Amino acid sequence: MRIATMNIQNLFHRDLSFLRQNASKNLQDWMEEFQSLLKNPNKQHQELGRMRELAFLMGFSPQATEPFLTLRRKGGHLYVKPLGGERQTKATERVGWNGWVELRSYPLDEKHRNAKVECIAKADPDILVLQEVEDRASLSDFNRDYLGPKLGGAFEQWLFTEGNDNRGLGHAILTRNGYRIVGFQPHAHERDQEGNDLFEMDCPEYTVVTPTGDELTIISTRCSEDSRDVDYSAKRKEQARRLDSYCNRLFGQGKDWIVICGTLGEVSYGNSLRPLLSDRKVRDITEHTVFEVIGDNEYKGFSNNESHSGWLAKHDYLLSSSVLYDRINRCGVYFPRVAQKTPISKLAPFKINVMDKPILAPPLLWGDYEGV
């Protein structure tokens, strides 16, 4: 049995709030770079081009992307055009329907999606667990149109579970080769000590039956991560404590085939994860002697306390109960190969498109379990 997990960070479109999170920091960098270029008395063609880009990014250009578009129906088709253009007649028999729509998401770059697909195809898993999936329709299209051609056939079963995230993000599990999804238990209703949602994106338990009839429990999680302004270590510790209670409940029921996967938001030796990791009831694959790294530059001796290609492995985990951990014969991490753009300056090293903010491609963790 091969299990793979990945924080997919959306399949086809991403909520605009992700763009706004770092807007102030980006704007500050753009202003500093623009000012430094402006002071240069001998500007070259490349520098002038960069200044035009910065003017667009900072809102000087009239071509800046707007949060609203006009939606028109013409000849049986819908068209969009930016606001602020020519005034148009409202709905009439001649013009047809006119209206406006607020954009809540933006499309993701195809190359980032293809890089993720390549990682999944290399892992070739029987069970695939994904975090931060936008909706079931996108999951279905992704499975059929992207994974199917790469894997010689789409996953036979898939399940999307939406949690508490107001952007609609949720978890997904896909299975094939005789592995069947037979049970699901949500934890979206659980509260923290302050009465708020304990898990911002739920923490679903999936029950999977193997081709031999054995039962496996997979818990997909997305714990709180610290931001620039907020420390979530207390809440993360409460989440880890609750995850530990799920394991104890399952062990008490005689279910010792348990996998916990996803983002825990902390280093393995961090205090907030002690309730889950200190007694080693579940262990991470990065500790295993057969753990391997595959990416743009393979790095031997990689551990969950180190970095590779700018990604901190210590925040993403594939944990296995002791029984399953002893059955691992291969495991590792795949890093998506995303083409790097040509550097332009130290402050803004890549050309940036407002609707395609460069993101760090997430890794894929996988484990091969013998006799399961």
Where in the sequence are the language-model features?
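N-terminal, active-site-proximal structural segment of metallo-dependent hydrolase catalytic domains
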Residues: M1-P149, L159-D165, L364
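Catalytic metal-binding/acid-base residues of hydrolase active sites
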Residues: Q9, E134, R222-S224, L264-V267, ...
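Metal-dependent phosphoester-hydrolase catalytic domains
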Residues: R2-A4, D192, L198, R249-V259, ...
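A long, amphipathic alpha-helix that forms part
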Residues: V230-D256
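Structured beta-strand-rich core segments of catalytic domains in phosphoester-bond hydrolases
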Residues: A64, I127-T217, T221
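Stable alpha-helical elements in mature extracytoplasmic
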Residues: H112, K116, D135-S138, R236-Q239, ...
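Active-site environment of divalent metal-dependent phosphoester hydrolases
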Residues: D135-A137, N166-G168, D226-R228, G265-N271
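Structural recognition of the beta-strand scaffold that forms the well-ordered cores
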Residues: R2-T5, D126-Q131, I173, T217-S220, ...
